Amino acid sequence: MSKDEYLITDAPLKALTVFAMPMILGSFFQQVYNMADSIIVGQFVGSSALAAVGACAALTNVFICVALGAGVGAGVLVSRYFGAKEYGKMKTIVSTSLISFLLLSIILGVFGFCFSHAMMSGLQTPADILEEAVLYLRVYFVGFPFLFMYNILSTMFTSIGESKIPLGLLIFSSILNIVMDLWMVAGLGLGVFGAALATLIAQGISAVFSLLIFLYRMRRYQSPFQWFDGRKLRSMLRIAVPSVLQQSTVSIGMMIVQAVVNPFGTQALAGYSATMRVENVFSLIFVSIGNAVSPYVSQNLGAGKTERIKKGYHAALVLDVCFAAVAFLVIETLHTQISALFLGKDGTALAYQVSGDYMRWIGYFFIFMGIKMATDGVLRGLGIMRPFLIANMVNLAIRLSVALICAPRFGIAFVWLAVPAGWLANFLVSYAALRNSWPGEKVEPSRIFS
């Protein structure tokens, strides 16, 4: 038995832990990679520049989610065929997805660059930070194809049970990004432009290395394949489109929430942006566990080992409980110090209050996000996308309705008060669908996805 096949042979808790831990560490470094801009800009340029970078986050997340959703469609099929040892079909999926999605990323990058000013103005970005925010965003879109390629390749690696290589690449690019941030922002005084340029260069180098390593890895699986297959692309899109819609719609919803926050002023936005970064750090731990569950489920389904799927789900829930407890303890004891990392000395009392209140509130309820992500991961791995999409729309509807209706009337706190309720509702809808969807027999991947 190949060492690559441990997701279908080892004990579920052991297999998921071994697989998920590099992904969790990778998520941490991904956020270090993202937070480096915010921390360094906040410390060396000021809270207004921090707000400019933070104002771009909701919009850039929409485009990132397109890349992540596209990766889900390819990743589910790669895992399924890998588990079934149909390596020719697996390599056809890989080639088809890289060609198709690279073209898509170029189109989206050009669109984003051309309409950066219009999009940021539409989000009611405060006038005193608008030009810096647009500058940061345009540099981001120049490098968008690199970001897209890296995310697709990272999903490919995890789909074949390899989570250590993406971790190594993330550590490398994170360190490079921080060094270049310090040089360009603190040393050369390039401000927001320097932070964006440092990120672009680090992403580009990481994407090229990822491609070279992945192509070398594919030589291990000798089997004839097609460079492009329209039927396989349609199979990918049947899974990818609901995932793109879900992730993009949620991010668009967060853009709307951003528009609700912006009128409260630059300092409130700075505090909100600081805690959004912190929420993303802990959220991506649970996202990583959910992302680990998907290839675990897909590989075992392809191998006909359906009895292992429910055991893997329970193992993921155990990991979620452990990390939720850690998140609570860290936030409860260090929330002020964490806020200071971003806001620096010129952060006002309002910025610190917004950041601290938001951070402590979500710290109590991360367990809801954990069980939601694990359940969603199983649904994705099984290819059951409609309930997955509906559940996430319910989550978004709760967050948006409370933010839009209550925050302008009763205060900014209502932006985050509904977050745990949305997570819990999402889990309940997803779990209701999952209870009726556990597979009970061997499923041939070629029969489902051809």
PLM feature spans:
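Hydrophobic transmembrane alpha-helices of multi-pass small-molecule transporters
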Residues: 62-65, 177-181, 206-211, 281-284, ...
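Helix-terminus/linker motif at the lipid-water interface of multi-pass membrane proteins
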Residues: 28, 32-50, 120-127, 183-190, ...
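Interfacial/gating helices of multi-pass transporter permease domains
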Residues: 18, 41-61, 127-132, 192-193, ...
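Small-residue-rich hydrophobic transmembrane alpha-helices
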Residues: 50-110, 147-166, 271-335, 369-383, ...
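Residue-level signal for short hydrophobic patches within transmembrane helices
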Residues: 9, 13-32, 36, 59-66, ...
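Short runs within selected transmembrane alpha-helices of multi-pass transporters and secretion channels
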Residues: 71, 140-158, 166-174, 195-208, ...
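Transmembrane helical elements of multi-pass membrane transporters/channels
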Residues: 18-37, 139, 173, 202-206, ...
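Short alpha-helical transmembrane segments in multi-pass integral membrane proteins
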Residues: 1-20, 78-143, 187-241, 297-364, ...
